[in-house]
Amino acid sequence: VAQTVSDSLYKRADRLIAMSEPLQKRLIARTGKPEKDVAVISQYCEDFYAVPCPDPDLQARFAGRFNLVFTGTMTPAQSLDMVLQAVLDARNAGAENLHLLLVGDGMSREALQALAEELHAGDAVTFYGSVPAEKVPSFTTLADALLISLSDSPDLGLTVPGKLASYMAAGKPVIASMNGAGYEAVKESGGGLASPACDQAALTQNLLALYRMPAADRAALGARSKAYYEAHYRRAELLRRL
């Protein structure tokens, strides 16, 4: 019933906005509207994510490590158990200073901490806990790379997560383990390395590749991420397109 009602409303609208190309295609198929009447406008990113915010205490605490930073909610949808195992695999393959810094909380945190103990992860992972959104740039500034991961679900691939936009705003390389629109955005941006959702071996190889990459090449990835944010996710640009 809900879909029938929503489809009816969609068909009556003069124009529709989809947050990604996959959603645009779905709306076109459900409504029969021409492509010109279904615009693609991504979710914007708040401007403060684009401002570097060095924190001397954080930098001192995590100095000497290759910091792979994840920010946000920890649920089964993020497949962080697979990520943790990929990080340990990469460390065993030579990325000995690789460090997974998890900033956030959620229903999966206790299970992840138990898994870390079971796998003897030790100092390979830090569970930092939740911080206010305005504090997140302190962690993205610290990061050598920023991690986004999603489980293998068709619905999760329909949109580009807002987190990816905030990562690109930070101007750091992105390590993505996901399918769909987010995967395609990372590939198109040239600002990071992307592997299919839940592919532990592929994620491990991308972690090793980024770890071994010259610093100048990693900086170039970050610059491309920033440029993609400016063109696609900056609030002022999206409001202009509206």
Protein language model features and the residues they cover:
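Conserved acidic donor-binding segment of nucleotide-sugar-dependent glycosyltransferases
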Residues: 188-189, 193-200, 209-215
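Membrane-proximal helix-turn-helix segments that form the acceptor-binding/catalytic region
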Residues: 1-16
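A short, well-ordered alpha-helix in the C-terminal region of glycosyltransferases
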Residues: 29, 209, 216-232
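Acidic anion/phosphate-binding donor-loop and adjacent secondary structure
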Residues: 28-29, 36, 44-60, 79
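Short hydrophobic beta-strand element within catalytic cores of glycosyltransferases
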Residues: 145-148, 166-177
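Nucleotide-activated donor-binding/catalytic signature segment of Leloir-type glycosyltransferases, i.e.
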Residues: 65, 103, 110-137
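Conserved donor-binding/catalytic core segment of Leloir-type glycosyltransferases
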Residues: 59-88, 101
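Carbohydrate-associated surface elements
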Residues: 22, 41-44
